[in-house]
Amino acid sequence: SVDESDILPEVFALRQNYPNPFNPVTTLRYNLPEQATVNIFIYDMLGRMINQLVSARQEPGYRSVQWDATDMYGKSVSAGIYLYQIQAGEFVQTRKMVLLK
């Protein structure tokens, strides 16, 4: 049998956060088929950057990061719709998530 952790993703992907809607914490999952410099940002619906969760060169694999609904200063953000975006090499993808209070 093959261990799933040995199987690498075939394509870059940003997956839907879980849980969604969420309060107070959600997990953002993403797939890296190759080593890449990864940046993950949180934006509000006006396009303002709220936080940066990842800024690192990462090895290929199935990865995840948690967001605790705080901004870059550690302050809780208000309920609403937020965007999360991955930039990994040339790959960019954005998804929506909902924070309930």
Please report, for each region that a protein language model flagged, where it lies by residue:
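Surface-exposed, proline-anchored Ser/Thr-rich loop/turn motifs
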Residues: 3-31, 43-48, 79, 98-101
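Beta-strand signatures of extracellular beta-sandwich domains
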Residues: 39-43, 52
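Surface-exposed loop/edge segments in extracytoplasmic proteins
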Residues: 48-54
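Extracellular and select intracellular beta-sandwich modules with Ser/Thr-enriched
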Residues: 91-95
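Conserved beta-strand and immediately adjacent loop positions that scaffold enzyme active sites
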Residues: 39, 66, 96
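Short proline/glycine-enriched turn/loop motifs at strand-loop junctions of beta-rich domains
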Residues: 33-37
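Short, surface-exposed loop/turn motifs with a glycine/proline- and acidic-biased composition
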Residues: 54-89
